[in-house]
């Protein structure tokens, strides 16, 4: 009973403090990372200077699909400045990495540092040359003699899915690396009896993430302790550490992966790459630091790509415009390999998962196949499935509105999940927790004066002007928790994040996370969260991120999760450290915990001028023995893992007003309005 009352009092005090003190989270503050980044003092992988570092250049496949008959490295090994030349045979002791999944009808392809036995796409690394400079390594590439036996090229995913197609991975017995079906109700029967049906085939072409900083890896090896540190321009250093531990048979305690400043990622740096495996292997084999920085052509050819899908979709409605069924067949071109850790499933399955969007559709049938082709692997890239699914569903809504003679906004509002209907499970099983679908669309319409805008459009059309109004709404699952992340059965848990917050003996606060900053301002955001819940000052909090050794478990930054999950972990850890500080201060100031408040970097007795700064309190805890009894002394630190379990939903409505000159085809964007549910600001 006493403990319960104490917890209640603590919760009430925290709520009162948050309500009365100046807001930190959501306040406009100067970004703490900006001074060094804007003055050119950022520290990226390529900026790291290591005496005697060796440089790698890769000879890449110039065939889309071919057997490797022979590789003659003799001339290259004799070239000036060349230290080593490695092929797949030299890496026999390195284990292949597999992006496993418990999902039915899924095949995991091996990921290796260099192509083994055959190549499956143009740009796949075949030989690694290591020399005293990148120039010398590049020169030696021309001395390699590789004999190939060309095989049938597999380009079209629909053809590749046929049993008669040439196989990229013979052991799989098929090019269909994954297939899945989502079904609610009887979509086919509902479509057959519907008053109105609209359908279309949509073709989405490949995109390549093109970050300002190319992919770069630097491996440093300490032979005496068999310790390897990989500096990588990765979004996911914790994931890379764990994968390399398996590949190299090295305990995690001897492997450290650090992502310093990263110049953008967009999903393209969120996966394990063959070059990372190779650089780590080479550094350990040679006992030297080894570095590879991709040039722009390599980055475009060998970084994972996205959005390569064919979608056949049909929407059925009754005569009043109520959507009754949605059906879709999706073929995802996943490239030559199932990428680690996300698997070939990541993009095509999410297209099908999110197709119902913000609409109530009782009957849904979505089928998807991920098909291997002779192209670079696909992986996460900006939105992962949502741009495709949103485009398809919104286009079908426009087609249906035209067929029914209804206003596109009115049709959407009729079919949207309404404010009192949350949480809502859509046909694929995704749950929208609390969304503002109708509120966002109404707000956007109000902002553009939608009814008058339609009147203007009618006048313009009557005058022969091409005046268009585009409307689109979306829903996105962000900050996903463990319940969602385990569904695909991947080899990692992407649904949690860990924070470690420590107040050291000087009173300084360090907050360590497993996420990685790529320009999104996480250093400032997380410092704000810690400051608010700890009672410190933003300027006094040092944020450590992108280091696999900083926290026990980490995955990284991707999928609109970093602020949500790392911020949640920061909140839990900061609150626990604050409780410890209050207990210590209560003893030192000889007052009850309920009379103490923590803010602005000090613990104060309410209504008095009695206070302890963080520095004074930390010295009493750590250095001034006897001030706090040994049995009551607590380390001012906490490590907490946050799991939102399901996740949260982000929603928005977009309205574009565009006019095209019918003579010159000049495009004029008159207005673009977005109404978004941004949560707490």
Q: Model-flagged regions — what are they?
A:
Residues 27, 33-36, 101-104, 109, ...:
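Glycine-rich loop/linker segments at domain edges
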Residues 191-198, 203-208, 413-502:
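Accessory "access/gating" subregions that flank catalytic or transport cores
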Residues 1-173, 177, 197, 285, ...:
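Flexible, low-hydrophobicity surface segments
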Residues 1-41, 428, 438-462, 478, ...:
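Intrinsic disorder at enzyme termini
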Residues 593, 602, 607-650:
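Internal maturation/activation junctions in enzymes
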């Amino acid at each position: 009973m006493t403990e319960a009352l104490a917890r209640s009092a603590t919760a009430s005090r925290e709520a009162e403090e948050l309500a009365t003190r100046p807001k930190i989270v959501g306040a406009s503050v100067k970004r703490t990372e900006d001074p060094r980044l804007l003055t050119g003092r950022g520290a990226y992988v390529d900026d790291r200077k290591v005496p005697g570092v060796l440089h790698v250049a890769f000879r890449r496949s110039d065939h889309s699909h071919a057997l490797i008959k022979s590789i003659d490295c003799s001339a290259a090994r004799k070239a000036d400045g060349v230290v080593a030349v490695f092929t797949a045979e030299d890496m026999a002791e390195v284990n292949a990495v597999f992006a496993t999944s418990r999902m039915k009808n899924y095949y995991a392809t091996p990921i290796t540092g260099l192509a083994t036995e055959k190549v499956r796409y143009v740009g796949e690394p075949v030989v690694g040359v290591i020399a005293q400079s990148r120039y010398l390594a590049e020169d030696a590439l021309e001395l390699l003699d590789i004999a190939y036996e060309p095989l049938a090229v597999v380009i079209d995913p629909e053809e590749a899915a046929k049993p008669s197609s040439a196989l990229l991975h013979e052991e799989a017995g098929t090019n269909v690396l994954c297939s899945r079906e989502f079904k609610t109700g009887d979509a086919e029967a509902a479509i057959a009896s519907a008053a109105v049906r609209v359908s279309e085939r949509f073709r989405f072409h490949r995109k390549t993430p093109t970050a300002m900083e190319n992919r770069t890896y630097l491996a440093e090896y300490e032979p005496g302790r068999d310790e390897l540190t990989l500096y990588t321009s990765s979004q996911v250093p914790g994931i890379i550490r764990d994968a390399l531990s398996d590949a190299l048979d090295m305990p995690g305690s001897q492997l450290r992966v650090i992502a310093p400043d990263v110049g953008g990622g967009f999903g393209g740096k969120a996966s394990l790459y063959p070059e990372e495996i190779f650089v780590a292997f080479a550094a350990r084999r040679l006992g030297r630091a080894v570095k590879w920085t991709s040039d722009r052509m390599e980055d475009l050819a060998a970084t994972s790509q996205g959005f390569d899908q064919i979608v056949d979709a049909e929407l059925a409605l009754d005569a009043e415009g109520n959507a009754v069924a949605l059906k879709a067949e999706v073929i995802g071109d996943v490239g030559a390999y199932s990428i680690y850790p996300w698997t070939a499933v990541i993009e095509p399955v999410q297209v099908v998962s999110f197709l119902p969007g913000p609409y109530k559709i009782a009957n849904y049938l979505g089928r998807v196949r991920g098909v291997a082709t002779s192209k670079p692997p696909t992986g996460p890239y900006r939105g992962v499935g949502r741009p495709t699914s949103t485009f398809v569903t919104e286009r079908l809504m426009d087609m249906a509105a035209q067929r029914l003679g209804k206003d596109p906004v009115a049709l959407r509002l009729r079919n949207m999940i309404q404010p009192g209907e949350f949480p809502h499970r859509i046909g694929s099983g995704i749950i929208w927790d609390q969304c503002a679908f109708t509120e966002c669309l109404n707000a956007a319409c109000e902002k553009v004066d939608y009814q008058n805008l339609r009147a203007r459009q009618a006048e313009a059309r009557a005058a022969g002007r091409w005046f268009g109004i585009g409307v689109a709404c979306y829903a996105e699952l962000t900050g996903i928790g463990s319940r969602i992340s385990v569904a695909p059965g991947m080899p990692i848990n992407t649904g949690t994040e860990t924070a470690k917050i420590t107040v050291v003996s000087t009173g300084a606060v360090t907050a360590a996370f497993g996420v990685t900053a790529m320009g999104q301002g996480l250093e400032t955001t997380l410092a704000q969260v810690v400051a608010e819940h700890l009672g410190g000052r933003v300027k006094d909090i040092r944020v450590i991120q992108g280091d696999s050794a900083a926290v026990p478990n980490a995955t990284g930054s991707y999928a609109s999760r970093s602020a949500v999950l790392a911020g949640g972990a920061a909140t839990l850890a900061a609150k626990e450290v604050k409780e410890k500080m209050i207990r210590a201060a209560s003893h030192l100031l000889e007052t009850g915990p309920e009379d103490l408040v923590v803010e602005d970097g000090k613990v104060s007795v309410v209504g008095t001028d009695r206070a302890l700064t963080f520095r004074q309190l930390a010295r009493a805890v750590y250095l001034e023995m006897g001030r706090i009894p040994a049995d009551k002394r607590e380390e001012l630190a906490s490590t907490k893992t946050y799991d939102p379990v399901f996740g949260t939903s982000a929603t928005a409505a977009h309205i574009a007003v565009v006019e095209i000159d019918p003579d010159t085809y000049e495009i004029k964007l008159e207005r673009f309005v977005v109404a978004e549910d941004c949560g707490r600001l």
